[in-house]
Amino acid sequence: MLLLPLGLAAGLSTLSFLPSVAASPPLAASFLGMAGLLAAGVLGVAARGRDRARTLRLRFVPVTAHWVQTGVHVALYTAWGLSWDGVADHVPHILAQILFYYAFDLLLAWWRGDEARTGFGPIPIVGSVNLFLWFHDDFFWLQFLLLAVGALAKELVHWQRDGRRTHIFNPSSFPLFLFCAVLWATNSDHMTWAQQIAVTQGLIPHAWLILFALGLAVQALFSTTLVTVGAVATLYALNLAYTQVTGVYCWVDVGIPAAIFLGCNFLVTDPSTSPRTARGRAAFGVLYGLAVFGLYLWLREVGGPAYYDKLLCVPFLNLLAQRLDRLGGSPAGGRANLGWVAAGAAGFAILYGSNFLGPNHAGKSLDFWERACEEDRWYACSSWSESLDFACHEGEWQRCEEHAVLTEEGVRLERDLPEAGYHYALACQEGLATACDRISGFLAEGGADALAAECDADDGFSCLVLGTLWSGDLAAPPDPDRSARATARIERACELDVPEACDFLGR
């Protein structure tokens, strides 16, 4: 029996020799290191079995829900991958995690008893985790640790429910909560792709339609429609109230971000860790909507990673599952669930048709945010800055210059000279003459000194910006020493692990 986890460990080590993996020594080392730990686990289980004269058994238990979830995840990753190359680059990472989870789960079961059960379950667990959080290659060993924590929680943290022992926490959401909390507390968010994941999911063409359509399969099979309906309806009501009070939109340019809509459809709809009754599931969804909305406002206010809003509340809701079932009502299934599926579809059609959901939200208008900023509405200036930055990176180069002016002046927003210099350089490099004309003045009027001070304090981004502004013909008049100083600053940025700087130097 132990040949199976040993073979999985061998498969994991083999993945380290793929060109895309081998090109990153820390990533390859994490694959090999985890394969070695699994092999050691095999030896440990074998020794424990001999000491206790045990016969290990394995049962393959295919669960319909798991292979349906797997199919949904494949479709979702495919749509996402067609709009962001990062998904294709991450495929070896996902395969490695699946091999690791299968092996770790088997070894954990055999360490604790004679029989292990397996099926398709590890695939959607890994898929769900990777819809929200990836670690950078330099820290990818933490991704395996995250999965191990989830497996341990599923195996060890139980309660009595409906006459049987079952796990309390969703094996995806619990480790996501734990790791996100630690990352935030230690100011280590830079170690992950969490923000890029949240942003790029909203760039999928027809993202909300795809998420809704795939979510229908989950809702129909698991009878979790009321969870999703409750969450989305609550977020809609809170958005309306927010706009009524502040005159602006909470999530800037969309009613519910795609990443949060994904959470409403897939993260909190695990039937094993959510309430079983119709009233309980509706309340569960309402509480999720309230928690996500409140967490977003709070994280934004304290300067935390607002993209963790959908992840930090789920384990606490899992703990309420049995209490919420005491609200009474019939089980959430059968024809009643199909009725709620139809009602949810009608509600989605209304929200999508009114542009509350989807890519055509009224908050897409830069003029709206400029006027709101001039009127000093709540968070309007920071939202305007965010919108300008997004438009800049979508190829509207004039918006880069506007963003630079906004952050250089420091009138409506806190002055941020590294950001201003970056956007001036980007606009100038793309041929915007007016931005090029501003650079010399920006450097002479305190920009160079501010960037140099930040660079000397080991801010790699400032080193890169200053080096970029000094390089080439961006900063007139000519300076014979400028090229050498520019290269030195960019080299320092590369030393400080700014990948764009290393790319600039060809390293």
What positions do the PLM features span?
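N-terminal signal-anchor module of multipass membrane proteins
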Residues: 1-110, 356
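C-terminal ends of transmembrane helices
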Residues: 41-57, 101-114, 150-165, 212-223, ...
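Membrane-interface helix-loop-helix junctions at boundaries between adjacent transmembrane segments
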Residues: 108-201
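Internal active-site segments that recognize and position negatively charged phosphoryl groups
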Residues: 175, 183-241
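Internal/C-terminal transmembrane anchor helices
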Residues: 334-359
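Short helix-capping/linker turns of helical repeat alpha-solenoids
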Residues: 375-378, 388-389, 394-397, 403, ...
